[in-house]
Structure formats: structure tokens, C-alpha cells
């Protein structure tokens, strides 16, 4: 008996392009539905701890001002 055919790509390209090959829609914020609850709670605290741009710039300027008169640390 002859061996049967294992694979063919016949007509697959036509079938795929019949309705067009579309890119997946880009999601700005991915859904958290079904995600681990423990992770989501931790994520909430992590987001709350982030500083706004203005706050971080203000803290940076304060840090620079406090180091103004001090000598630079010596590295060995």
C-alpha cells in the first residue's frame, strides 16, 4: 500500500485571506478580569506609591539643594 499524504498547505492561504488577515487590536489597558487577586491588590499599592512628575522633580531639587555646601564623597 502507498503511504498516505502527511501534510498539505493547499487552499489555506486563500481561506486566510478571504476575510483578510487582521492585526490584533491594540489595548491601552489590558483587562484585569481573571487575574490573580493577590497580584491586583499589590498592584494597587504599587501604583499609589509612584510619585507624580512634579513631586519627583521637587524632591530631586530639594536633594540637590541639601547637598550644595557638602563636599563630594570620596570613592576608593
Swiss-Prot record:
Keyword Secreted: no
Feature: compositional bias, Basic residues: 1-29
Signal peptide per UniProt: none
Positions carrying Phosphoserine: 31
Record key words, sorted: Phosphoprotein, Ribonucleoprotein, Ribosomal protein
Gene Ontology terms: cellular component: cytosolic large ribosomal subunit; cytosolic ribosome
Region (Disordered): 1-33, 47-76
Residue spans of biased composition, Basic and acidic residues class: 51-62
Single GO term (MF): structural constituent of ribosome
Any single biological process term in GO: cytoplasmic translation
Matches recorded under InterPro entries: Ribosomal_eL29 (IPR002673)
Entry superkingdom: Eukaryota
Pfam family, one: Ribosomal_L29e
PANTHER family attached to this UniProt entry: 60S RIBOSOMAL PROTEIN L29
Family assignment from sequence similarity: Belongs to the eukaryotic ribosomal protein eL29 family.
Protein name as annotated: Large ribosomal subunit protein eL29
